Amino acid sequence: MNGQRGTMVVSLDLELCWGRFDKVPVPMLEADASEERIQIRRLLALLDRYEIPATWAIVGHLMLAGCSRHAGAAHTDVMPRPDYSWFPKDWYVHDPCTSAIQSPGWYAPDILEWIRATRVRHEIASHSFAHIYYGDPECSATAARADLTAAVVAASQHDVPLRSFVFPRNQVGHLDVLRAQGIRAYRGADPTRFRRTKGALYKTLSFLDQLLGLPPKAVRAEEVMPGLWNIPGNHFYMARNGVRKM
């Protein structure tokens, strides 16, 4: 637009079982996680082959080698929890509180090492600690702060500084919490007009978008707070399965 060259940012959400436990049965998630591990290795090889660096936004709990329960509860140090009316259980109800060897869908420090061992230098970003939804009105600032603090601590165990953030389900919220923890950039909401709709209309328009292969529009990074930048996502890559094979 002004003669300057653009930059393409490839950001990948690494969440395994943490990404959908509120929607999908755990046995199915764990089976999917096993397949995801295979595909992650293939993707890393491709990125190396074509010398493409990516931002890997990792759920912080995956960086743990394991965890255990205290007084019958998981992660009593990560308090308070978000108080979602649509998920009345404890957020960690499905956390196996075992180890990466026993539960590789819930812990993945090995995948972190795969990423760091590649020839291409990738960025490690945060995707929260336990995939809570910061932008949900029922997620308080104190809950977001506790979650992000836990993510920073988990990353520090691997000497990984966190400077970028990807919101779970792309629900943006509590930007002041991010900035206070040293986050400098986050992936913001897609500015495409139809992506702001909800329900059946969104699903219909999204399907047509995928079917027609409409090109994404260029976006600009925006400094939303001093030292904190919004880099909007503008193209969501989907697996070619089901009707998307068309």
What is each PLM-predicted segment?
Residues I231-G242:
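Positively charged, amphipathic and often flexible ligand-engagement surfaces
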Residues M1-S164, R169-I231, M246:
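Catalytic alpha-helical scaffold of carbohydrate-active enzymes acting on polysaccharides/glycoconjugates
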